[in-house]
Amino acid sequence: QVCPYYKDLNDPRVVSSIALVHQRFSTNTFPSWELAHPYRMIAHNGEINTVKGNFNWLRARERAVETAVLGDDVKKLLPIIYEGQSDTACLDNMLELLVMSGYPLAQAVMLTIPEAWEQAKGQMDPAQRAFYEYYAAMLEPWDGPAAVGFTDGVRIGAVLDRNGLRPGRYILTNDDIVILASEAGTLPIPQSQIKKKWRLQPGKMFMIDTEQGRIIEDEEIKRTLALSNPYKEWTKRLNIHLSDVVAPPPLPNNNPVPLIKRQEAFGYGEDDIKFVLRPMAEKGAEAIGSMGNDTPLAMLSHRAKPFYQYFRQLFAQVTNPPIDPIREQLVMSLVSFVGPRPNLLDINNVNPPLRLELSQPILGMEEMAKMRRIDRYTGDKFRSYEIDTTYRVAWGEEGVEARLASLCARAVDAVKDGYNILILTDRKMSEERVAIPMPLAISAIHQHLIAAGLRTNTGLVIETGSAFQTHHMAVLAAYGAEAIHPYLALETIEQLYKPGNPSGIDVKTATQNYIHAIGKTFKKIMSKMGISTYMSYRGAQ
């Protein structure tokens, strides 16, 4: 099929020791030549579920990207990814950019499609795990069921996604021919000529170097790259774990507005406390309910609905398998980094910015107190700035737009003044002041900072009374939040589980259960889209 189409392939002078071929039917997109593989560097079987988030974050980086290899010419490459392309074309653009900026091909593949390193302590080589952790702050995974074949014309290889949801099988013949395909028996090779049969495993890589004339196995590839720099030392020096920061004394709660009034203002109902908060606080999991949702759509309801109700969660369709977040939790991760992001293309950066690492994005009272005073505990390396998202009731409906404009301007000024963590808070909500819906505030500031080329210089932390369900947290994460502090939900739990309460559960246990339940349900929401990591989900809209 290929040779009659490309006449030059019939010329006997065209000789190659490698070939990257792709043949399949289209399952969830209409077949067209624009979507045909291979692209410049890859061919791909599967789906990149995180492509929207990857695209958005790459756009956020474009204004700040610099590379010594390309110099000023890097600006000619913008936009790095064009809208309307397939997921494979986007990944191909990303991989090509990394390779052209100086990354070895195998390293570029490891950055974009990493193994599940987060839960692999004690199971993965420490140097290799440090490699992945170092680059995790620079680039979120391109995640989804994928078997990717790649080549730069000299080296050719393949890699499997972290879940191993697409097959990859290869054989080595006696005369040193290697055939790797999505299934065995692609070409009719007699059994007597087969020296070795094997398969790609989840997150593993297989590569052939035609210059060296040999096969390079996964362990050698990754071991060599992991030892090419002192990544273990770098992560120890650069990564600050919020859990390791000394806990400050708790901040006093001086809010003059009674708890019940604030609950009413933020849309809490008796059913929310009884069927949402209590099961989470007591059992560490969301309440079990029937499938489906027969309540009216928010836009058609006669009752005022929380802003979050206007959003719906997407789910994987057609050939795109969801993930089981319970049985496959080893490949899932809620790790989040808050603060400025290193320049991805500066491969020789000797003084990259520090990273503030969170094991999961939901902050308790103690963690929020640390975040608010982070400058004291990190020697001013991290500086937080609080932005009030409330406005005067007297301003009316017009006040929302005016306040959003001022919030965006304040965010830009704060980042330019050196604040690398912005805390958006609605704590000052009162009878005279109303809170802008937090999804509106975070999305406006997130997009404005992207347009100003400043989004990668700062982190966005949400402190809100409006979020108490996992769906609420997921909406905030999808619009750019690195961390979320649901203070009113936690205050409500404190009231419910005072000493002497009938359940016998203390406040500390109830709070830990609630945060654990949010994380557990968050994984379920991500898994419905076939996404394994919070870093890939965040900012994907």
Descriptions of predicted regions:
Residues 1-8, 104, 217, 364, ...:
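Short, solvent-exposed coil/turn linker segments
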Residues 10-14, 37, 283, 287, ...:
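Non-catalytic terminal/interface segments that mediate subunit docking, oligomerization
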Residues 16, 21-75, 101, 115-147, ...:
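Glycine-rich phosphate/ribose-binding loops and adjacent secondary-structure elements
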Residues 527-541:
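Charge-patterned, long linear interaction tracts outside catalytic cores
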